[in-house]
Amino acid sequence: MRAMRLAAVAMATAGLSLAGPAIVEAKTPAAAVKTVAPESVGFDSARLKKLDDYMAGVIAQKRVAGMTTLLVRHGKVVAFNTYGTMDGQSPMTKDAIFRIYSMSKPVTGVAMMILYEEGKWKLDDPVTKFIPEFRNLKVMTGVGPDGKPTTVPVTRPPTMREIMSHTAGFGYGLQIREPVDKMFRERGVLWSADLPDMIGKVADIPLKFQPGTDWSYSIAVDIQGYLVEKLSGQKLGDFMQSRIFGPLKMTDTGFYTGADKASRLAKLYQTDIRTWQMVPATELFGGAVPDYTKKPALESGGGGLVSTTVDYGRFAQMLLNKGELDGARILAPATVELMGTNVIPKSVLETLSTKQGGSFSDAVGFGMDVMVVNDARKAGSISGDGEMSWGGAAGTWFWVDPTNDLYFVGMVQRLGGTGGEDLQIMSRLLTYQALVKPEN
């Protein structure tokens, strides 16, 4: 699990804004983006070049084929860079479309919080209020002599708070080290025919632990996608388009590109576990890589979206602005603050600080579909308190830092890691070492 971040998108006084009306007149939104002098927003240009040099080095080392990065502070674009190629030949473009996988999760979280504001659900509602199929959930306790799982009934149904924070106990199937995850993989949960089919499969697989007693990355955000459909009466993609993508002018974000934008979809690579080299991707979590140019039958809120650097930057800027961008109000400020507030119980955090390799502690927790930094210095980071972040399976990442009023979006397309230093860690470090006048 990795920490990622976000921040702000716009233009200098003499330029255009990423969010402004003039963008619509450009061929793509990326074409209208202008950058400002780093010093005008507190950065040192020479120190910031270390970030550019590092990313260029990642390409030179053939760790990824191509990359884009976007750094924004005070709504002004400090740096918007491309590196490498789209497909091993064509240069990477600023309007390239990427499979963002789990960076879909914060978007689904926003969709859920829109419905929360409408009174459609409450944090302590049992999920069975909306999904009766989960009434007979069980918890795995071990494996019997016959090789089958031994289970006990849940002491209570998971709550919506737990569904929003990976503390409900569900498995996932991204990895198959644990028995529950192996069941997810064997039953093809991620490859279900549609969301109702997925819910039926999940209902028959035991939880990893009693709800609220642990944290485990899970299918919960795909369950949220199903909940969005039930609570809104719309398909997930239609709801996101009408309530998020349309208002935010995220013109290239959705569950597929369509034939007209297929040429802008960056090629997907994976790590060959025998050589640790980068090769074209053929497999994804036990199945074939989907065709992202065609509308899927199952719209995955947990990992199905494609997007561009600029589009996701607009989403990040909305969060940084506490729910609003260019006059489009998506959420109330207090709701964004709620999303960015840790909801993992203290007793669970104390256990996780060791079990999750130090990823969680009283300094770093998890809110509504985002990782949150409560105390950056205590966490050993030079970023800001209140940071929200996440990333995706193919290496995409972002963070939003309200303390320093900035965000960062990074896009790559390599499954299985980037074969070296963690891009999220290095991009954060090199960004903040260059922010020498945070008061500006």
Which positions does each model-derived feature cover?
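Positively charged n-region of N-terminal signal peptides that target proteins for export
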Residues: 1-5
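Bacterial N-terminal signal peptides
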Residues: 8-19
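Signal peptide processing junction and immediate N-terminal pro/mature segment
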Residues: 18-29
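Short, conserved catalytic-motif segment at the N-terminal edge
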Residues: 33-100, 120-122, 136-145, 421, ...
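Active-site SXXK
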Residues: 49-56, 69, 75-77, 97-131, ...
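A generic structural motif
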Residues: 84-85, 285, 414
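Short, surface-exposed beta-strand/loop micro-motifs that present aromatic residues
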Residues: 387-389, 394-407
